Amino acid sequence: MILTEHLSKRFGPLTAVADLSLEVGSGEIVGFLGPNGAGKTTTLRLLMGFLNPSSGRCSVLGGSLLTQPHLRRRVGYLPGDFRMDSAMTGRDLFRWFSRLRGGVEQNRIDQLVERLQLDPTRPFGALSKGNRQKIGVIQAFMHDPKVLILDEPTSGLDPLIQREFLSLVREAADRGVAVLFSSHVLPEVERMASRVAIIRSGRLVTLSSVDELLDRARHRLELRFADPVPTELFRDVSGVVAHEVDGKTVVITLDGPVGPAMQVASSRPGLLRVSPASDELEDLFVTLYGGAPSEDQHA
């Protein structure tokens, strides 16, 4: 229901998305992860038809939203920076979105307003970031779309409302809705997504189920040496799919026999200790990137 094939987008000399192929099927929830400027927001805007691809193609519900904008009525989209007319109230905005989509049952809107604890009578400009985000979430869900494309959807929401949002997403997936959401909050992705697509510098680094990623996290070793270790020590070693060097400590992620890595480690004088590394998904993310996850800059 959501598809990209060798999708690329360039802005002059900058490549924001490079040869990205990804598919999200009916009832599937895919978390889209990446550090600053990774290309997540650009990918979502390409899917929505707001940008022209430089090469490759993308489709939603079997068509291009760029050339078939009527398909947007069946898509729920939440941009990363949701802005509306500051004078319009929540009710005004819901009526406006309802007209755009050919009509929405008021009962559905009222239900979402109650679940997200929103006062729809206040003007948008007078609302906090969290309450503005609630309006964004409601407009994305209120017409019961077949596809949800959500950019940092829980930004600004308090923990209680975040839990309600997760329930809305799961309910949508149970109805067969395809969900693609970007996030930098790894526990959120771990709870909600069936698969995780990790992007860096516009390229897909990995596409795995959450269970597979956690399994990879459990196949990690921490090696402690007496002296600082060259960053290239475990490069191209069979079975080592990622490595992180921090002075005298190396964390390696294995996808195969441990023997070749241990042979390299033991061949270097001063190996002091080998122990299991953390099995947290966030630590695996850091190993894949060599840096901590952070908010997208909407590249």
Kindly give the residue locations of the regions a language model identified.
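Short, charged/small-residue-rich alpha-helical element at the C-terminal edge
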Residues: H219-G291, A299
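Short loop/turn segments at beta->alpha junctions
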Residues: T89, S209, A277-E280
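ABC transporter nucleotide-binding domain
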Residues: F165-L254
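ABC transporter nucleotide-binding domains
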Residues: I2-T4, K9-R200, V205-T206
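ABC-family P-loop ATPase nucleotide-binding domain
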Residues: M1-S8, G291-A299
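Active-site phosphate/pyrophosphate- and oxyanion-stabilizing loops and adjacent acidic/basic residues
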Residues: R95, P187, D211, Q263, ...
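Non-catalytic alpha-helical coupling and interface elements of nucleotide-dependent molecular machines
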Residues: R99-G102, G290-S294
